[in-house]
Design a protein with these regions (language model features):
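A short helix->loop->beta-strand "cap" motif at the edges of active sites that frequently abuts
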Residues: 72-73, 171-174
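S-adenosyl-L-methionine
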Residues: 1-95, 128-129, 144, 187, ...
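Short beta-strand segments
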Residues: 101, 151, 177-180
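Short, glycine/acidic-enriched loop or turn micro-motifs at the edges of active sites
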Residues: 59-63, 82, 106, 154-156, ...
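Short internal loop-to-helix segment that lines adenine-nucleotide cofactor pockets
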Residues: 31-55, 110-114, 123-172, 183-188
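Conserved beta-strand termini and adjacent loop/short-helix elements that scaffold enzyme active sites
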Residues: 25, 100-102, 137, 199-200
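Core alpha/beta nucleotide-donor-binding catalytic domains of modification enzymes
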Residues: 78, 82-120
């Protein structure tokens, strides 16, 4: 599909990286993550012990997977929206970034996705009222040999993603950051020894680690 009328190059620098291909109408999914990256990066440096493998979702237009690729040897990023993924593919051309045009969830199935606003393309979400069907996979299906960090901003779908990652989490005990936290997540992570770490890791991210 031709997205040329919907995207443009944005020369705002993030960590000395510029020339981002981005959805022209969007500001929310660029400005917010850009300002959050500093405290989130510091949280990663403070709590992650090894920097081999990170799983990240949603990949959005590619800012965080691209930045994480300078910290980790391998980055697995998932982004279900075709337009966002088009930008992500342009922005994330490093060989250590593995890109999937799909969502993460608790099982392998098709779900509906709703596009919320082109002014914030990070707000697209899984919803029963969505008009687009997208595939979901589980983190456990990746059969990773290592996993040091899981970063999830899935617009409320985080409990489903964690449920589909329990084998991986139990095996490797990665540091986890989540935008949405509820009792279901606490019930999944607490038996493994996870604690929520106090601190500021961006405007909405919460960090969990085994201490």
């Amino acid at each position: 599909m031709d997205y040329s009328e919907l995207v443009s190059i944005r020369n705002n620098s993030v960590e000395e990286i510029s020339s981002w291909l981005w959805v022209t109408e969007d500001n929310g999914a660029f400005d917010g993550p850009k300002s959050d990256w500093g405290p989130l990066k510091q949280g990663i440096l403070d709590h992650v012990k090894n920097f081999d493998v990170v799983v990240q979702a949603g990949g959005n237009c590619g800012m965080y997977p691209r930045l994480l690729s300078d910290m980790f040897k391998r980055v697995y990023t998932f982004e279900p929206d075709p337009l966002n993924f088009h930008c992500l593919s342009y922005n994330c051309q490093k060989d250590n970034i593995y890109k999937m045009n799909a969502a993460l969830g608790e099982t392998n199935k098709l779900v509906r996705m709703q596009r919320v606003s082109m002014a914030n393309v990070g707000g697209h979400r899984v919803s029963d009222t969505g008009d687009t069907f997208i595939p979901t996979f589980t983190i456990d299906q990746l059969a990773l040999d290592k996993c040091d960090y899981i970063s999830l901003d899935c617009e409320g779908y985080e409990p489903n993603v964690i449920a589909g990652a329990m084998e991986t989490i139990a095996k490797f005990l990665p540091v986890i950051t989540l935008e949405t936290v509820n009792e279901e997540i606490n019930m999944l992570l607490s038996p493994l020894g996870y604690k929520r770490i106090d601190g500021h890791f961006g405007h909405a991210d919460k960090l969990f680690a085994v201490k």
